[in-house]
Amino acid sequence: MTYTGSIRCEGDTWDLASSVGATATMVAAARAMATRAANPLINDQFAEPLVRAVGVDVLTRLASGELTASDIDDPERPNASMVRMAEHHAVRTKFFDEFFMDATRAGIRQVVILASGLDSRAYRLAWPAQTVVYEIDQPQVMEFKTRTLAELGATPTADRRVVTADLRADWPTALGAAGFDPTQPTAWSAEGLLRYLPPEAQDRLLDNVTALSVPDSRFATESIRNFKPHHEERMRERMTILANRWRAYGFDLDMNELVYFGDRNEPASYLSDNGWLLTEIKSQDLLTANGFQPFEDEEVPLPDFFYVSARLQRKHRQYPAHRKPAPSWRHTACPVNELSKSAAYTMTRSDAHQASTTAPPPPGLTG
């Protein structure tokens, strides 16, 4: 099967104003908007100055309140609403904030934030003494955030340790070099991350998290059921509408070019098969619980979108007969350091992988 639809290249990199990095800035702008709400769900005092420092004009104006989410929306396209997206990110941020605080109340003092972007939890949450927070992301992202927060006079509320690594590669080695202790229970998060990874990279990441965790470790992420064809079409249409609205404000960001569609192992099932005890809540229910209207049915191409928190019970891998390995993709090389819209990212299923029943060992954890 040939799959084309992303301009992502194997090993591509970014800063906070381009490609995947720009989505981190967009999410930080949403957190700034949520912080300014009349009855805020969250308080991220660093979101607005971080967005301002990145320098994307429309996101700075949204973060500062000069523009509102409704200013961005097209009234004739209510299904592609920046207002609803801002509500979603407020609820999501609160979910992960509470996940980490619950983990520390259970005695966990080691935290790993995967793809931390402009996440400022190491500075704004009330971590107990002796808590170590590891943040992993691309070098340009981590350098920018660390420098900007230092210039703001911000001080971490935990022992913050920066890990610069690509989550598609051997990040466990870099994490270990920063002092990570695999004998201690850990609270992990993969917030807004997995759909930006190719299917095999997602599985490797979850395998690595499991291999580096002892029982009673915790993990939080989102789990999305695989797209049905008509759902994918509607999601792509919504992303295109939002991209056109962003372009009207001088911001060129099209999520269609950044996320990976196509079948993959569903994270919740994958974690359960590998010894994690799951607690799930639908996005719709979490919106309602926090005082927002749920999406109307016709708005939602992904009704099976869950927030997942998990606790590791057993430390061994399973390969149930009902679970197929993720497709193995051969990556067609893109031009080096180029994200040209004319250069599609093509992936071809490996026939050899279809006959495989055992996943390869995680990178960085081989003997």
UniProtKB/Swiss-Prot annotation:
Keywords: Methyltransferase, S-adenosyl-L-methionine, Transferase. Residues 348-367 are annotated as: Disordered. GO terms for biological process: methylation. Its EC number is 2.1.1.-. Residues 348-358 have a biased composition (Polar residues). GO terms for molecular function: methyltransferase activity. Belongs to the UPF0677 family. Exhibits S-adenosyl-L-methionine-dependent methyltransferase activity. This is Putative S-adenosyl-L-methionine-dependent methyltransferase MRA_0734. It comes from Mycobacterium tuberculosis (strain ATCC 25177 / H37Ra).
